Amino acid sequence: MDKFWWRAAWGLCLVPLSLAQIDLNITCRYAGVFHVEKNGRYSISRTEAADLCKAFNSTLPTMAQMQKALNIGFETCRIGFIEGHVVIPPIHPNSICAANNTGVYILTSNTSQYDTYCFNASAPPEEDCTSVTDLPNAFEGPITITIVNRDGTRYTKKGEYRTNPEDINPSTPADDDVSSGSSSERSTSGGYSIFHTHLPTTRPTQDQSSPWVSDSPEKTPTTKDRASGGRAQTTHGSETSGHSTGSQEGGASTTSGPIRRPQIPEWLIILASLLALALILAVCIAVNSRRRCGQKKKLVINNGNGAVDDRKASGLNGEASRSQEMVHLVNKESSETQDQFMTADETRNLQNVDMKIGV
């Protein structure tokens, strides 16, 4: 029992240590723009996004910088913060990503927790997938920060980058549900107005670093209010169903997302796991102790009659002799039965002879 309580105390001591860790997954840089994910997806607030980019010696990208990154191949289906907006930057249409739209897909709400995009002005102008090995602008702190690059290399550093106390010690769970990583995109919460831009279906012959808004009014993406009678068209998106309806022409639309679920604190999950493990160990120890107590020991009495091996040999000989005696007894019983039958027949014959003589 003492061991059980000792292990439980040791597990409780490990809980805060396991929580004082931050994993930052980063992608390749496209014209200086890259995507950052913290501890799974969608766990970065607006204020933390700015602090995180600053720690990487970067800033939140502008719309023009995002569009330039898309022009050279940057694509992801993840919601993230940029300067003044929350965007999804898909290149190819996908029914479960930005409602089948392409370009810089903008959500007007920026109050929830998402991932973030950062822009490093000193990065190469094209694609750059070299590993990031440092968080240069992080300051001293107790947090273990691990940078996970696209190729799987990991670099760990002790420190802190968050300056907002609400980001360091959140008092309430995030508004949006945090889901595990996948290539598909979750739906945005209901009531958001969404704007988007279009990429051309074929690449133009002119310089691709030109502004993302065309000068010609025919090609300029427009934003129109498609509400009719006080009702706006609704786009229903879901990761699981993959169906979407509504406008895809750049008009304002709203999306309805899945039901929000409260987050379970990590320390509670770890504590429950430790308690379950301790309970299993306690049951195993109790069963093992009971089994040992219930075992029967075989008592061997020698009485000075030689070694145990000699007694085993004599016991085997005795068993053989007893089996032979049983065979003799069976043979003897069968012969006695035959003699009894013969005596009875002779007696009947003599009686018949006497009766004949008497007659």
Swiss-Prot record:
Q: Where is the composition biased (Polar residues)?
A: 199-213
Disulphide bridges: C28-C129, C53-C118, C77-C97
Question: Where are the Cytoplasmic topological domains?
Answer: 288-359
What organism does the UniProt record list as the source? Equus caballus (Horse)
Extracellular topological intervals = 21-266
Region annotation Required for interaction with EZR, MSN and RDX and for co-localization to microvilli: residue ranges? 290-308
Listed A to Z, the keywords are: Cell adhesion, Cell membrane, Cell projection, Disulfide bond, Glycoprotein, Membrane, Phosphoprotein, Proteoglycan, Receptor, Secreted, Signal, Transmembrane, Transmembrane helix
Single GO biological process annotation from the record: cell adhesion
Known role: Cell-surface receptor that plays a role in cell-cell interactions, as well as cell adhesion and migration, helping them to sense and respond to changes in the tissue microenvironment. Participates thereby in a wide variety of cellular functions including the activation, recirculation and homing of T-lymphocytes, hematopoiesis, inflammation and response to bacterial infection.
GO molecular function terms attached to this record: hyaluronic acid binding; transmembrane signaling receptor activity
Residues with the Phosphoserine modification: S289, S314, S323
- The protein's gene is named CD44
Localization in the cell: Cell membrane; Cell projection, Microvillus; Secreted
Q: Which Pfam families match?
A: Xlink
The stretch of residues making up the signal peptide is: 1-20
Protein name (Swiss-Prot/TrEMBL)? CD44 antigen
Instruction: Please give the CDD domains that the UniProt record associates with this protein.
Output: Link_domain_CD44_like
- Region: Stem; residue ranges are 225-266
Q: Where is the Link domain?
A: 32-120
* Low complexity bias locations: 179-193, 233-251
Q: What is its main location?
A: membrane
| Topological type in the membrane | Single-pass type I membrane protein
Transmembrane segment boundaries: 267-287
Q: What is known of its domains?
A: The lectin-like LINK domain is responsible for hyaluronan binding.
